[in-house]
């Protein structure tokens, strides 16, 4: 008898058999790209080895070895776990049923399998315990549903199947699996999973397809797509479509395993470009191969989501028939069944495709309708190809679409549904081209179509009274705005040309104009929509890169606005756009900048051409209203102000001036540095005031300090008094961007920064921070631009680069080396993209050769990845790939 004392068989030979078998499968897969065959053949290879080892171990005839889970259904991916159950006869429990010799033998068996190279996940259970575990855990029950016999007692396996079949309750199984799916979707909906989705678990992943088949099998409708087609749940064309998308996802998952050399189901940034190259996907500038691969994935996932939703609704209707639902006729095309909208006849959309848009309107106009029946949704999905050029030209259809945009409720929900089922992309072909298109610009975390619909959703949210507390100004403005559907149209088209060669704003306005003209919109409305699409980045760029306290900046911006209606529309679109890129991009400081720009421009447009709130005398008066000084204090304030020129008063608002005056008017010639802090008015961030005898590297020292404590400088205002003192103010954000600050935080900054400025020790060279994986795989080409400003008094230094810790310190130290003085700084971070603007002066700026050297040094410190040395390239000179913007 074989067993522990039998002559051991050569596990090394078995290990080599497994290794060579897997290598052969990998070679064959890369030759024929047949994923289904690989999964099946890999399962077969492992089956043979497990049977051989089970036989050699001479396991008792009363036991059985089962394959379960994905391996059980013969879909074994290259590095997936091999899930097994050792089935024991019912003798109390598994521990009781397993005598000492069997326990030792199983322990030896598990160790042997690991030595051979099989990553197994195993459990030892009796038939009764399998039933109990399955009853308590839907995941266990689902895994055991896939069980098949590998070796051992077939009668025991039959008993196991009977128990599993007896306890399978289709209704409970459906409810549990649906809840499990909802929880999984919620878990994988976070932004990182959108950028790096899990092919198996994310919404639209392989698990969503398996879920449909598990429920179908539990209800007795079949366990394959062809069986579901035979039962009439889907048509054969749809079965082929599902199979095709399943193949796409399986292929990507197989390649991920091989590329990573391990079980890897996430499309990490590290793998996106290599996978694309392996699949022969070429770049189509400005889009990288990885972005095109991800569009292929997102479109497959979208199809899977469609199938999953429709089939689960269909199965629900079969498993939970609602025979008592009251039916009310709405018109000759639609009826209300219960609280769902239902088509009266199955082919209504084929006979009248316009009814697709009518169904959208009916859902919006009837609050008592909670959704569509499975038959309506399925017919809508199947009829999407009927939306053709002639459909789009039909005046009735154009009128209905515009009516959809005008509805006071349900717009966001219906636009998202129209996108999910292919309606929106067919009605607006330009929108169809950006579905599933990723944007690796380091601040968008959504695909272009998701971002666009998020922008529309943000605009709609401003309309809702229950959310008015979030953005009171935006809520008031949009509720007073005539024809808000024009804003929604601008939102739909603002990024619609992303991914094409050329300026997406200019290309998008062409699409927008074509749409408006096809829908016979008035010229005035068309002009506004087209103008918004063309200028949708203008307000954000002005607020974040220019000094909006400068009257000339406001005047120039106001001139580009045309009128107050254009300004209001652009403000609402800009706030919605920035908020729709990523939860991390929007913050209170950006909101305050945009709001200040809006108010100042609005005043200018309304005839206050002197910009009363910005004028010097008016500012002084407002400061005095805040301070209420007596005569002695007034004299001190006047002395303090006499040491400041008009640029200081223009640069700071009255509250800032009052704060500075309070702390500095009695200490104008302080021998020691003065550092004061307070919570920012925006609710996030800390305002820091620094007053000290001026020194050439002061800005760099302050940057170095905040870099050392992981605070981000988002704004700097630099001023030198007539007495030679630096009066600098900063807005900084802590690493966690909290709104409620501990007083000890303020005390720490004041004490530590004062000490650092007093010591004037040599600054350490900033160490390049660790890059995020996103930035490492999708680096931003640094851009540097140095141009004189309109006044001729300063130069504007604009920098774009990938953000990382220490970046501002490195920039500041370069400026010190070249003898430049920083007068103001706008530090704008969009996700992981830094767009910084500095107002500088220095003698070298009039020398073109020196400026080129400055640009080259800045490019060098801005690079986010190690720069390989190029033969023949002189040190300090930018390479051809670097962008120095010509003057």
From Swiss-Prot:
Residues 330-686 are annotated as: Uridylyl-removing. Belongs to the GlnD family. InterPro entries: ACT-like_dom_sf (IPR045865), ACT_dom (IPR002912), HD/PDEase_dom (IPR003607), HD_domain (IPR006674), NT_sf (IPR043519), PII_UdlTrfase/GS_AdlTrfase (IPR013546), UTase/UR (IPR010043). NCBIfam families: PRK03059.1, UTase_glnD. Coiled coil: none annotated. This is Bifunctional uridylyltransferase/uridylyl-removing enzyme. One of its GO terms (molecular function) is [protein-PII] uridylyltransferase activity. Residues 864-887 are annotated as: Disordered. It comes from Nitrosospira multiformis (strain ATCC 25196 / NCIMB 11849 / C 71). Pfam families: GlnD_UR_UTase, HD. Its EC number is 2.7.7.59, 3.1.4.-. GO terms for biological process: regulation of nitrogen utilization.
């Amino acid at each position: 008898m074989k067993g522990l004392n039998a002559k051991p068989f050569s596990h090394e030979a078995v290990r080599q058999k497994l290794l060579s078998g897997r290598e052969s499968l990998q070679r064959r897969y890369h030759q024929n790209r047949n994923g289904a065959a690989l999964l099946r053949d890999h399962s077969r290879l492992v089956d043979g080895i497990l049977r051989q080892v089970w036989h050699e171990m001479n396991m008792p005839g009363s036991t059985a070895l089962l394959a379960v889970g994905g391996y059980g259904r013969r879909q074994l991916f290259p590095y997936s776990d091999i899930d097994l159950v050792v089935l024991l006869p019912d003798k109390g429990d598994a521990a009781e049923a397993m005598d000492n010799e069997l326990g030792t033998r199983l322990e030896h068996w598990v160790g042997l399998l690991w030595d051979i190279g099989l990553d197994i996940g195993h459990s030892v259970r009796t038939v009764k315990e399998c039933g109990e575990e399955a009853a308590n855990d839907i995941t266990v029950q689902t895994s055991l549903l896939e069980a098949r016999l590998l070796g051992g007692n077939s009668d025991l396996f039959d008993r196991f199947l009977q128990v599993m079949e007896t306890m399978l309750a289709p209704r409970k199984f459906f409810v549990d699996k649906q809840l499990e799916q909802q929880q999984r979707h919620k878990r994988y909906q976070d932004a990182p999973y959108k950028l790096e989705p899990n092919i198996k678990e994310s919404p639209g992943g392989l698990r969503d397809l398996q879920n449909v088949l598990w429920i179908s099998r539990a209800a007795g409708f079949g366990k394959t797509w062809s069986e579901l087609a035979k039962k009439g749940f889907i048509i054969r064309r749809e079965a082929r479509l599902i199979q095709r998308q399943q193949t796409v996802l399986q292929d990507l998952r197989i390649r991920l395993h091989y590329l990573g050399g391990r079980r890897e189901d996430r499309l990490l940034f590290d793998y996106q470009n290599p996978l694309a190259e392996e699949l022969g996907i070429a770049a189509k500038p400005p889009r990288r191969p990885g972005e095109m691969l991800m569009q292929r994935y997102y479109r497959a996932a979208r199809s899977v989501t469609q199938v999953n939703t429709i089939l689960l609704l269909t199965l629900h209707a079969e498993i939970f028939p609602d025979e008592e639902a009251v039916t009310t006729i709405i018109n000759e095309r639609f009826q209300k069944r219960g609280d769902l909208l239902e088509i009266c006849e199955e082919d209504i959309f084929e006979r009248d495709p316009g009814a697709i848009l009518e169904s959208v309107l009916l859902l919006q106009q009837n609050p008592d309708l909670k959704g569509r029946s499975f038959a309506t949704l399925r017919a809508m999905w199947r009829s999407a190809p009927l939306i053709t050029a002639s459909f789009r030209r039909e005046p009735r259809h154009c009128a209905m679409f515009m009516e959809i945009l005008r509805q006071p409720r349900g717009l966001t929900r219906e636009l998202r549904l129209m996108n999910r089922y292919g309606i929106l992309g067919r009605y607006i072909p330009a929108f169809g081209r950006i579905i599933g298109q990723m944007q690796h610009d380091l601040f968008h975390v959504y695909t272009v179509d998701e971002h666009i619909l998020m922008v529309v959703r943000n605009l709609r949210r401003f309309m809702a009274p229950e959310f008015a507390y979030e953005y009171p100004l935006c809520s008031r403005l949009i509720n007073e705005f005539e024809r808000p559907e024009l804003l929604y149209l601008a939102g739909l088209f603002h990024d619609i040309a992303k991914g094409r060669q050329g300026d997406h704003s200019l290309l998008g306005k062409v699409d927008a104009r074509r749409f408006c003209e096809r829908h016979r919109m008035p010229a005035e409305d068309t002009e506004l929509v087209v103008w918004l699409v063309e200028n949708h980045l203008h307000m954000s760029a002005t607020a974040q890169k220019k000094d909006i306290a400068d009257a000339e900046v406001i005047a120039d911006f106001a001139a580009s606005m045309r009128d107050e209606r254009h300004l209001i529309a652009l403000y609402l679109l800009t706030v919605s756009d920035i908020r729709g890129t990523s939860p991390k991009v929007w913050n209170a400081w950006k909101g305050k900048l945009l709001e200040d720009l809006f108010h100042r421009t609005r005043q200018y447009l309304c005839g206050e051409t002197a910009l009363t709130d910005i004028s010097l005398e008016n500012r002084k008066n407002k400061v005095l209203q805040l301070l209420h000084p007596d005569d002695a204090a007034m004299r001190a304030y006047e002395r303090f102000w006499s040491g400041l020129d008009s640029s200081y008063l223009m640069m700071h608002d009255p509250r800032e001036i009052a704060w500075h005056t309070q702390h500095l008017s009695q200490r104008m010639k302080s021998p020691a540095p003065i550092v004061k802090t307070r919570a920012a008015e925006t609710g996030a961030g800390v305002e820091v005031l620094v007053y000290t005898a001026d020194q050439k590297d002061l800005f760099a020292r302050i940057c170095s300090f905040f870099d050392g404590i992981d605070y981000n400088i988002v704004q700097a205002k630099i001023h030198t008094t007539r007495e030679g003192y630096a009066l600098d103010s900063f807005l900084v954000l802590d690493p966690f961007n909290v709104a409620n600050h501990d007083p000890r935080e303020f005390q720490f900054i004041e004490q530590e920064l004062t000490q650092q400025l007093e010591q004037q020790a040599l600054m350490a060279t900033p160490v390049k921070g660790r890059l995020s994986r996103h930035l490492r795989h999708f680096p931003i080409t640094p851009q540097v631009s140095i141009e004189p400003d309109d006044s001729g008094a300063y130069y504007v230094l604009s920098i774009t680069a990938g953000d990382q810790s220490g970046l501002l310190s490195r920039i500041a130290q370069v400026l010190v080396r070249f003898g430049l003085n920083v007068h103001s700084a706008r530090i704008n971070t969009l996700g992981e993209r830094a767009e910084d603007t500095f107002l500088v002066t220095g003698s070298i700026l009039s020398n073109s050769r020196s400026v080129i050297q400055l640009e080259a040094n800045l490019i060098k410190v801005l690079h986010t990845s190690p720069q390989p040395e190029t033969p023949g390239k002189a040190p300090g000179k930018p390479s051809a790939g670097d962008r120095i913007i010509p003057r």
